[in-house]
A protein has these predicted regions:
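Conserved catalytic core of nucleotide polymerization and phosphodiester-bond processing enzymes
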Residues: 1-167
């Protein structure tokens, strides 16, 4: 059970679904679902963490524990963010973890090992909602209208994983 495994890594104790430390499984589940693509305290709240017995004071330590237990994922977020940023800033090509980023004809292409491409229209550097520099691009927002969207390492990783997971039947 992935949620038991996650909780076990985070809290350094064995966790069994209906056995030892089973009370920690729910924390592992919420953390796995909310934090895997860069979420933090806000994502935990959005996933209902406070409704599942977690307290406000437990949320930040839970984020920290998940990230400590998953250093390779956190590093992948950073590496992908650096690659996308370099690609957009320098209008160049760069590769990380077998994933190629290329700027061409006003678009950023992410070439996946499967051969599939992800395309980001009119990418440029801008400020995100926190006031930090990030890659932005034109896309369709929640209101089904074109607008400038911000992105960052974990979001690109989410798109990459989804792109790799698609199956044609």
């Amino acid at each position: 059970d992935i949620y038991c495994a996650s909780a076990s890594q985070m809290f350094y104790v064995p966790v069994e679904k209906h056995g030892f430390n089973s009370h920690l499984r729910q924390k592992g589940k919420i953390a796995e679902l909310a934090l895997g693509y860069g979420g933090s305290v806000g994502a935990l709240k959005a996933m209902g963490a406070l409704n599942y017995g977690l307290t406000e004071d437990e949320l930040k330590p839970l984020v920290d524990a998940w990230r400590r237990a998953n250093p390779n994922i956190v590093q992948l977020w950073r590496d992908v963010d650096r690659a996308a940023t370099a690609c957009v800033k320098e209008h160049s090509e760069t590769t990380t973890h077998g994933i190629r980023f290329r700027y061409k004809s006003g678009m950023m292409f992410i070439y996946l090992p499967s051969g599939r491409k992800l395309v980001y229209v009119k990418p440029k550097m801008g400020l995100n909602r926190f006031g930090n520099e990030s890659v932005t691009y034109e896309g369709i927002g929640e209101q089904k209208k074109w607008l400038r969207l911000e992105s960052y390492g974990p979001k690109f990783v989410e798109n990459i994983v989804q792109g790799l997971s698609l199956i044609h039947i």
